[in-house]
Amino acid sequence: GCGYGRNLFEIFYGGGPREAKYIGGEFTKSGVEIAQKLAKKAPKMKTEFFHFNHLEPKLPFKKPFKRAFVFTCHSIEQVMQINENWFDEVVKAGEFVRGAHLEPFGFQLKNSGPLSDMHKDFMIQNSWNINFAEVLRQALERKIIKDEQIFLEMGVTPDVNVGSLA
């Protein structure tokens, strides 16, 4: 999830659109509560924070926005297997939806050598995500989404948790 909304606040204060509504879904009650408290300190920023579960994805909106940008950043990683309808639900955010998912899934698509092996072992050892690439592939096949580009293994963290972008 979005945690306490750090990425949303950084985008807004880093020059993000002032007219946009910044919406964050977070699994933990404490994360949602902290994000809501921080949002009160940012009165010029339009925000909404809600409970979101990657295992049972549901968006709380009554109707879709005209345009939506949906992104995840090392959020899905902590859910061993996301629901196969994850993308089906997320595209309901808007009439036109652009997505960007910086998640550690590169090893699921291609073995690039020792780093991929270490990363896969790390993910399995921690019971972290092992099906993002498959759910993405199925959503592409069903034409729920269309892929423009995938960038594998873009950065390395000290614990070999390498992010890829879809």
Regions inferred by a protein language model and the residue ranges of each:
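A conserved beta-strand element that flanks and buttresses the S-adenosyl-L-methionine
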Residues: 70-71
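A short, conserved alpha-helix within the catalytic core of class I
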Residues: 78-90
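Class I SAM-dependent methyltransferase SAM/SAH-binding core
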Residues: 6-56
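Conserved beta-strand signature within the Rossmann-like core of class I S-adenosyl-L-methionine
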Residues: 96-107
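Short conserved loop adjoining the S-adenosyl-L-methionine
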Residues: 56-64
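Conserved glycine-rich SAM-binding loop
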Residues: 3
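Conserved Class I S-adenosyl-L-methionine
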Residues: 114-141
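Core SAM-dependent methyltransferase catalytic element
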Residues: 152-166
